[in-house]
Amino acid sequence: MCDDLTAIDEDLALASKGLSRRDFAGLSAAGMLTACTTTEVADAAATRETAVAIATPDGTADALFIHPAKGRHPAVIMWPDVAGLREAYRQMATRLAASGYAVLVVNHYYRAAKAPLLASMAEWRSPAGQEKLKPAIATLSPANTVKDATAFVAWLDKQAAVDKRRKIGTQGYCQTGSFAVRTAAALPGRVGVAASFHGGGLVTPAPDSPHLLLTKTKAAFLIAIAKNDDARAPSDKAALQAAAAAAGKSAEIEVYNADHGWCTLDAPSYDKAEADRAWARLLALYSGL
């Protein structure tokens, strides 16, 4: 989770690279993302990007829809991390689209403001950034996630770039790892794969804890856990494995050799090697949509 202990781990990761948090924040978004560029896709498809507005029961959600310029493709809903929809996630969605997917990367904070609320993960780690996000975070709830996911899937199924004959994938990061699971549970007829990267809140005491929802899904799961998250909640992986087994679901549940945030391009803990490994597992599962 993105808590004070995670911030300490991030400081240590930056120090190992010879950077302070001030140094990291001072890097331009373009420069940081260039430095963190992940492996390019062989024979990548040309993509098309559109800023879209999607009607939901609570208003209008802004999002980016990025897909190959030609043809119909399986759809994917990408839920950004705690810092919200921003340049890092636009680049991540573009990379996925270039692999042959119609990607909707959403602003899950739309009830509070249009994206980007923050420019980078570094801004989230500042007192001003955290204060700015408080009202937006307060709008989140399991019920709202389900409403939004239902609206997003309905919208995707109307798009010419989406192949409705194929299942939908969904992936979440940090706090939205649980959103991916809830999406799969709410729309079992459409969601074929759900992935959580350094996700939080997957195992809770609540009766609607995400791990208890696996029985309501028809999806395969990729649960990629950060090593520092695992150190703080070592029993979660076993609970997830037991829940998947009880539900009869295919689930890759693994603790990666990287810290919370390692898959997000502009995170201090970004780890290219482990991010690429997780990305390869994601594409392997998505190939079956």
Where are these regions (language model features)?
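N-terminal export leaders
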Residues: L19-L33
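Primarily recognizes the serine-hydrolase "nucleophile elbow" in alpha/beta-hydrolase
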Residues: T150-H211
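Short beta-strand element of the alpha/beta-hydrolase
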Residues: H73-D81
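N-terminal secretory signal peptides
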Residues: M1-L19
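Gly/Ser-rich "nucleophile elbow"/oxyanion-hole loop immediately N-terminal to the catalytic nucleophile
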Residues: M121-G169
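N-terminal cap/lid segment of alpha/beta-hydrolase-fold proteins
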Residues: T39-P68
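C-terminal catalytic histidine-bearing segment of alpha/beta-hydrolase fold enzymes
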Residues: G248-L289
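Short beta-strand/loop motif that positions the catalytic acidic residue
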Residues: T217, I223-I225
